[in-house]
């Protein structure tokens, strides 16, 4: 796939990487792309043979500016916490904790809060070429993952919409219009801020906001000059 089509690429637990994939990621980030990866990145190739030289393998360490030197697998009921360096925000951790060794120039975004690796990097950010590479070394809670993704979206210059919980948003474009789709997946009515235009499902004109009934949807056509 041509990764340059995307402003942001997310690699969750990409344990196996085929030869040549790392080079695609490298070129994508060097050319200005933003990538977010998690623990267990690039451990083996397509034959389940470990990449030699450390993890993440096949040259991905240079892109992310970090080496995963050890993996702590937590028992059910055990946990840790990530502490954000700039805000002191804390997020809970379960299941996996990689011990990360940041390279020179790599920003430590969050550190572990307990155990023998307390104070060591848990989340990192590396500027590589014209782009950005984020590495999440532990299984964070939803708030922790959201904090990393918000930062990555900002670097990728992707506008993040402030939507009610359970509302999905999708956008498609034609030569003369944008089509905004809002889907309420909850069992409650919600009010959402939308673009001014015509709701193609109801046939009504919408000015800035509307209420979506439970399990309801709308498709707003916004004319583009």
What are these regions (language model features)?
Residues 1-2:
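A short, well-structured beta->alpha microelement
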Residues 7:
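Conserved acidic residues
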Residues 12-225:
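A conserved amphipathic helix/loop scaffold
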């Amino acid at each position: 796939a041509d990764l340059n089509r995307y402003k942001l690429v997310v690699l969750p637990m990409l344990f196996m990487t085929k030869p040549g994939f790392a080079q695609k990621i490298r070129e994508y980030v060097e050319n200005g792309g933003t990538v977010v990866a998690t623990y267990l990145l690039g451990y083996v190739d397509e034959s389940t043979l470990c990449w030699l030289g450390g993890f993440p393998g096949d040259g991905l360490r240079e892109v992310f500016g970090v080496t995963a030197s050890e993996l702590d697998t937590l028992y059910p009921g055990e946990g840790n916490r990530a502490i954000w360096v700039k805000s002191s925000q804390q997020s809970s951790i379960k299941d996996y904790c990689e011990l990360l060794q940041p390279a020179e120039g790599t920003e430590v975004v969050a550190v572990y809060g307990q155990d023998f690796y307390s104070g060591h990097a848990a989340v990192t950010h590396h500027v590589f070429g014209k782009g950005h590479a984020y590495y999440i070394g532990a299984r964070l809670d939803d708030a922790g993952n959201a904090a990393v993704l918000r930062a990555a979206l900002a670097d990728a210059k992707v506008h993040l919409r402030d939507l009610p919980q359970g509302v999905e948003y999708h956008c498609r474009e034609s030569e003369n219009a944008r089509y905004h789709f809002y889907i309420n997946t909850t069992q409650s009515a919600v009010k959402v801020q939308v673009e001014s235009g015509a709701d193609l499902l109801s046939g009504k004109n919408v000015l800035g906001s509307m209420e979506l009934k439970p399990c309801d949807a709308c498709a707003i056509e916004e004319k583009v000059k």
